[in-house]
């Protein structure tokens, strides 16, 4: 299979690993891990991170430059469409007309599961207002297709609950979403280790977004490197086409003309 580049909202990206900017012990660790990951897209929680709203506080953009990275503002912490839309509008103002955003509307504080009703409502309004919407959603393929039909530029189903590190709990659903999508499908939430990231890519996903898996590791910088390599390995494995599973053994060497 021939690889095709990752294209989101008509822009081509080299890396299929997207990383978050939160949960690190300080901005220096954020920078070191981000550099090691070699990601092109860095997501930022507008309601929790200073990117210019507070002039007297450290600005994330001083170490994660928009000239080097594509900044992906997200609506983490929003529980309804109104707040999410307002947050996206603020991000557009702070980033000088930036239209690429990650829509994330949560259902409750215990599971952080997406509120699909509010997500669908907000997605339509944002698309109608010129935003390029990458959307966090459940692993329901019908919902995913509806979000695509609304005009979202990327579908981002969860692998498992945000920050849980449980990995991909329902791979069949993820494969169904990917099979029916005509926009990029990127895993968002639940990745815990490098093998989880590789598995997501082997399922055919176009990329993986993660934060906790790197930031909460004992060695975030080393884990960033592991995730970078896992994404590459998983993609190459998918493109290669794995061997068929068999019920019985099959010798690697021929069984004729033996000594």
Swiss-Prot record:
Pfam families reported in the protein's UniProt record: ThiG (PF05690)
Q: Which UniProt keywords apply?
A: Cytoplasm, Schiff base, Thiamine biosynthesis, Transferase
Please list the reactions this protein catalyses: [ThiS sulfur-carrier protein]-C-terminal-Gly-aminoethanethioate + 2-iminoacetate + 1-deoxy-D-xylulose 5-phosphate = [ThiS sulfur-carrier protein]-C-terminal Gly-Gly + 2-[(2R,5Z)-2-carboxy-4-methylthiazol-5(2H)-ylidene]ethyl phosphate + 2 H2O + H(+)
The reply to whether Repeat figures as a keyword in the UniProt entry is no
Keyword Transferase recorded: yes
Question: Which biological processes are named by the entry's GO terms?
Answer: thiamine diphosphate biosynthetic process
Q: Which GO terms describe its cellular component?
A: cytoplasm
Could you tell me where this protein is found in the cell? Cytoplasm
Q: Where does 1-deoxy-D-xylulose 5-phosphate bind?
A: 163, 189-190, 211-212
Named in its record, the pathway it takes part in is: Cofactor biosynthesis; thiamine diphosphate biosynthesis
Question: A GO molecular-function term, please?
Answer: thiazole synthase activity
Active-site residues, record numbering mapped to chain = 102 (schiff-base intermediate with dxp)
**InterPro entries (UniProt xref):** Aldolase_TIM, Thiazole_synthase_ThiG, ThiG
Q: Return the EC number.
A: 2.8.1.10
Q: Which SUPFAM superfamilies match?
A: ThiG-like
Quaternary context:
Homotetramer. Forms heterodimers with either ThiH or ThiS.
Task: State the similarity comment.
Answer: Belongs to the ThiG family.
Protein function: Catalyzes the rearrangement of 1-deoxy-D-xylulose 5-phosphate (DXP) to produce the thiazole phosphate moiety of thiamine. Sulfur is provided by the thiocarboxylate moiety of the carrier protein ThiS. In vitro, sulfur can be provided by H(2)S.
Protein name as annotated? Thiazole synthase
> Which species does this protein come from?
Vesicomyosocius okutanii subsp. Calyptogena okutanii (strain HA)
């Amino acid at each position: 299979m021939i690889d095709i580049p990752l294209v989101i909202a008509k822009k081509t990206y080299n890396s299929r690993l997207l990383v978050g900017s939160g949960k690190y012990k300080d901005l220096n660790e954020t920078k070191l891990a981000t550099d090691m990951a070699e990601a092109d897209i860095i997501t930022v929680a507008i309601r929790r991170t200073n990117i210019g709203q507070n002039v007297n506080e450290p600005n994330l953009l001083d170490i994660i430059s928009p000239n080097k990275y594509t900044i992906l503002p997200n609506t983490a912490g929003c529980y309804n469409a109104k707040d999410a839309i307002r947050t996206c509008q603020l991000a557009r103002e702070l980033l000088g007309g930036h239209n690429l955003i990650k829509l994330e509307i949560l259902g409750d504080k215990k599971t952080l599961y997406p509120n699909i009703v509010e997500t669908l409502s907000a997605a339509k309004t944002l698309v109608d207002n010129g935003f390029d919407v990458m959307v966090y959603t459940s692993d329901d393929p019908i919902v995913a297709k509806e979000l695509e039909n609304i005009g979202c530029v990327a579908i981002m189903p969860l692998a498992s609950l945000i920050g849980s590190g449980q990995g991909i709990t329902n791979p069949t659903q993820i494969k169904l979403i990917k099979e029916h999508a005509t926009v990029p499908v990127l895993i968002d939430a639940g990745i815990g280790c490098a093998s989880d990231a590789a598995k997501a890519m082997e399922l055919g996903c176009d990329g993986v977004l993660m934060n906790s898996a790197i930031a909460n590791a004992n060695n975030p910088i080393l884990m960033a490197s592991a995730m970078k390599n896992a994404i590459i390995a998983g993609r190459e494995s998918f493109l290669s086409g794995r061997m068929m599973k068999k019920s019985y053994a099959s010798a690697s060497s021929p069984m004729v003309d033996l000594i």
